[in-house]
């Protein structure tokens, strides 16, 4: 029964992941199979640029899932993230005859008007209502209030139309139909953030290979979403500039890399070995890694809108491959001065029952 099986494909900055799950009676999902394909040939910074290769990649993932499930897959959910997305604020104002009582129809009209906004080369993928302003009072639920002016504040999540077209073409080439597209960062937030964190205010930082995604929540509402075109691969490339291949640089990053080292703990005579013959100065290595991770963390903090910077009772939640860098919490604290930082470990974060209904 197809309804029981759910297949999601998530396009990351360095890999495409296919996840097959079975829906349980309580709405939860049991993950049955996970397949990952290297996507460096077809996706750059989360944007499809080679349609044929992406199509081949998708076909390969679907075939592997079919083999594991022994089941025919005809449609998939697609998680979108990466640099094709960004968020913008929008305000819609409606002047009303004096003492009009606001109805839910008026609210729906406001939301529709927001959804019908056009942006050059971009499409609205999702919209989060921030708040309403009734005359001069802010309200989250203004229905039933008398007013002569109603204003809606929205956060629109946009993505590039070209990206959408390329993605559709890639799926057409693989012969799979898209059941629904969803925003990977929102699905991730649903999976890893607690209600208390979203309510009290928090920043979710997803450190990817080529991109870092920042989501800000307050009072249970998404307030900002941004994708920074920097990630773990930038650190690797910087290490490689010390005259070594990227695979060696990646191995050294995992072995020696640290986001923060006390100056007194740096031994000027210590060398880190690349292989049997070659080594690099530990100080140089430490400085290179720190410079880049500091740049990424500063960019992350810069993305947090100033009106929410002091409303983060839930703190900062780190996820993605880059969170495994040693002392990453210390580095974040140095820049943000926020003490509450936790790492969210998860295996497959994609499918939550809200996407599967």
What does each model-identified segment do?
Residues 1-15, 19-204, 221-223, 232, ...:
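Nucleotide/phosphate-binding catalytic cleft detector across ATP-hydrolyzing
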Residues 200-241:
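Glycine-rich phosphate-binding loop of actin/hexokinase-like ATP-binding domains
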């Amino acid at each position: 029964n197809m309804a029981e099986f759910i297949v999601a494909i998530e396009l990351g900055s360095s890999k495409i992941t296919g996840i097959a799950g079975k829906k349980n009676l309580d709405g939860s999902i049991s993950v049955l199979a996970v397949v990952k394909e290297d996507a460096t040939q077809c996706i750059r910074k989360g944007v499809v640029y080679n349609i044929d290769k992406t199509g081949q990649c998708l076909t390969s993932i679907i075939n592997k899932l079919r083999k594991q499930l022994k089941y025919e897959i005809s449609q998939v959910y697609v998680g979108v993230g990466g640099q094709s997305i960004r968020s913008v604020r929008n305000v819609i104002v409606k002047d009303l005859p004096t003492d009009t009582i606001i109805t839910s129809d008026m609210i729906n009209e406001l939301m529709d008007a927001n959804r019908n906004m056009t942006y050059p080369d971009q499409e609205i993928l999702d919209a989060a209502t921030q708040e309403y302003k009734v005359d001069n009072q802010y309200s989250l639920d203004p229905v039933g209030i008398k007013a002569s002016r109603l204003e809606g504040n929205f956060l629109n999540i946009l993505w590039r139309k070209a990206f959408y077209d390329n993605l559709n073409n890639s799926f057409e080439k693989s012969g799979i139909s898209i059941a629904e597209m969803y925003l990977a960062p929102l699905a991730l937030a649903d999976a890893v953030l607690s209600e208390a964190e979203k309510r009290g205010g928090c920043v979710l930082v997803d450190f990817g290979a080529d991109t870092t995604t920042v989501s800000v929540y307050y009072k249970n509402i998404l307030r900002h979403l941004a994708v920074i075109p920097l990630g773990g691969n930038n650190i690797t490339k910087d290490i490689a500039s010390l005259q070594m291949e990227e695979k060696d640089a990646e191995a050294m990053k995992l072995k020696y890399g640290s986001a923060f080292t006390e100056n007194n703990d740096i031994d000027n005579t210590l060398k880190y070995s690349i292989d049997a013959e070659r080594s690099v100065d530990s100080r140089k290595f430490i400085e290179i890694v720190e410079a880049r991770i500091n740049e990424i963390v500063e960019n992350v903090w810069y993305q947090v809108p100033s009106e929410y910077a002091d409303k983060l009772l839930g703190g900062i939640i780190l996820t993605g491959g880059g969170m495994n860098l040693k002392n990453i919490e210390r580095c974040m604290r140095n820049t943000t001065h926020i003490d509450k930082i936790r790492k969210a470990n998860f295996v497959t974060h994609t499918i939550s029952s809200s996407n599967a209904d």
